[in-house]
């Protein structure tokens, strides 16, 4: 299964200690270079930066081969969202992980299957990967 992730779902899953759901559900997760850069930004929470210090083998950073877009709607997105959509399109990804509403709408118009952080958690719960909360 080919899964491409934008910044926010990965950052949220790391922050709540549930990043390991990604390989359990999907195998490898691919992030474009812009997402990797966003994850390393100064404002990124320390827990995420620490996790990125020793990234797991299931997380793969790949560059998009897309040239500059001539689509104003795509250009309006931030670099991570833009590259995640472009990479998901190039790879014919089975799933794009994205929380941003505008990015999700654009991806859906491109007929890319999209889910967000809550969708990942819901799927994990359905297949029994989450323990019951108190």
Whereabouts are the PLM-identified features?
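Acidic, PIN/NYN-like endoribonuclease modules and their adjacent C-terminal/linker elements
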Residues: 43-45, 104-134
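Active-site-proximal, substrate-binding regions of enzyme catalytic domains
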Residues: 1-95, 101, 105-112
């Amino acid at each position: 299964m080919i899964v491409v992730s934008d910044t926010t779902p990965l950052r949220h899953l790391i922050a709540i200690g549930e990043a390991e759901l990604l390989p359990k559900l999907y195998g490898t997760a691919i992030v474009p270079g812009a997402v990797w850069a966003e994850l390393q930004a100064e404002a990124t929470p320390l827990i995420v930066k620490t996790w990125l210090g020793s990234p797991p083998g299931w997380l793969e950073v790949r560059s998009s081969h897309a040239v500059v877009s001539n689509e104003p709607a795509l250009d309006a997105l931030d670099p991570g969202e833009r590259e995640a959509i472009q990479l998901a399109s190039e790879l014919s990804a089975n799933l794009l992980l994205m929380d941003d509403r505008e990015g999700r709408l654009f991806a859906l118009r491109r007929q890319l299957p999209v889910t967000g952080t809550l969708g990942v958690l819901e799927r994990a719960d359905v297949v029994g990967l989450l323990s019951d909360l108190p």
